[in-house]
Amino acid sequence: MKRREFLKSALAAGATLSAPAIFSAAKAQSRQETLLIVSESGPNNLDIHGVGTNVPGYEVSWNCYDRLIGHEMKTGPNGQPYYDKDKFKMELADDMKLGDMSATFKLKKNAVFQDGTPITAKDVKWSLDRAVTVGGFPTFQMAAGSLTKPEQFVVVDDNTVRVDFARKDRLTIPDLAVIVPCVLNSELVKKQATEKDPWGLDYVKQNTVGSGAYKVVSWVAGTEVVFERNEKWIGGPAPKVKKIIWRMVPSAGNRRALLERGDADISYDLPNKDFVELKSDGKLNIISTPYSNGIQYIGMNVKNPPFDNPKVRQAVAYAIPYQKIMDAVLFGLAKPMYGAPANASTEVAWPQPHKFNTDIAKAKALMAEAGYPNGFETTISFDLGFAGVNEPICVLTQESLAQIGIKCTINKVPGANWRTELNKKVLPLYTNVFSGWLDYPEYFFIWCYHGKNSIFNTMSYQSKETDAFIDGAVTAAANGDKATYEKDVEGFVDQAYADMPRIPLYQPYVNVAMQKNVSGYAYWFHRRLDYRTLAKG
């Protein structure tokens, strides 16, 4: 898809709030060996397999657990290190042999968990069994790569595990390199398991039990996570940073102040206005990278009135104040996903823009055709954990929808509860972001549009036509049938934009601000920080 030019707005100077000095906990150590990260919200669970684990929880799992394989790096679109979705490297495995319908992994013989327990093939199998059995997000994530049954994971010997393929699927091997198929200390977790909690979810929620480069030594939910380097890690060169302190600082003004006076080393969820101003100041390093396979969107619950009516959904799509959001909320730091030319052909790509633009007259006409000439009342919800973007989007949308008679009450959901509330699939109208870990169009649509109704099909959208296109693309990709694959990708994109159960707004950027003496940032599919490569000069 061709890149698009976007508006760069003139910025008004903003007052910076005073902020507390919060690096005192690290003064006893060399500042070069300790990194302070500040963000708006933090993890609600240390276990990627846990119920309702939020996005910040992904960062904990990524840095504290190993997987059998990972990705090589390449140079990204902005010249920075960027994961290579097509190239894999060994992580916990020392060797991978690919067969026609299986992959066999030899484990590193000297690999141990953070408590010194040797890692065996039994730990790998138990961990993968857990992922496909525990339910919810992790189980659906594994299924996206056709990994669905414990019988697919076979212990060959203490040092060898085999993964049997359910079918040919190009997503299977990439799916083993995402966060979910991490390896846990099975014997330790089993000791904490109960009849009601056979997978030890309660224990792993509070404790890291992996072999990754870092381990959590303390966690106060909503306040702070402290990591220490795992000196027993053998997955690569020893990380240069010994200690990571991750503080939750809700005020964006305070986070900016901490960066500007040098107390904090990294922040990655400041308002876009701040990132633009900080980049202009030149005192910090600012890195902006488009989300891979990701969009911010307005979602509608299509199983219940009034959003079960396609004309209502189209009316909302015409009423969204797209350009105002780009200008006033994002300050140009995003790729628009709206306003494609009326004669534009659908591309074999995702994300790609739809053809809707703000047109209040069209929206009013569609509301009348749908039987709602006077509108209706509803709520629009957002995740408070990312309020800096979500709240102004909802306010601007509320104002614009009022012009077509839709009166919205804004529902602010605490970040720790957001995933749980969203997964109930009862929110009528909401904004959210989704970024597919595997950078393939069909992967995004499996999660967000397929009638299997994954947790990320937050609209409860059902379409046999869309399902047929998605399933066809998966099969065609596995068989190398390029022509059918392209036809099916175009088909499910067209169907999604005709039915419009969710309205793409833009492809977000990951914006990271860091001190000039911090190096080693790399972009990953999960959009979170990888501590292994970070360093301080």
Predicted features along the sequence, with ranges:
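N-terminal lobe/hinge region of extracytoplasmic solute-binding protein
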Residues: 38-100, 129, 209-213
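Long beta-strand-rich cores associated with HINT superfamily self-processing modules
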Residues: 512-537
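Periplasmic-binding protein-like
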Residues: 47-50, 172-176, 274-277, 287, ...
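Gly/Pro-rich hinge or "lid" segments in bacterial periplasmic/extracellular proteins
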Residues: 70-78, 82-83, 87, 179-239, ...
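Structural transition elements
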Residues: 214, 335-369, 386-392, 480
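Surface-exposed binding/hinge segments that line
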Residues: 97, 141-193, 220
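Ligand-site clamp/hinge motif
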Residues: 202, 231-277, 399, 407-409
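Extracytoplasmic/peripheral linker and loop segments enriched in polar/acidic and small residues
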Residues: 101, 326, 403-418, 423, ...
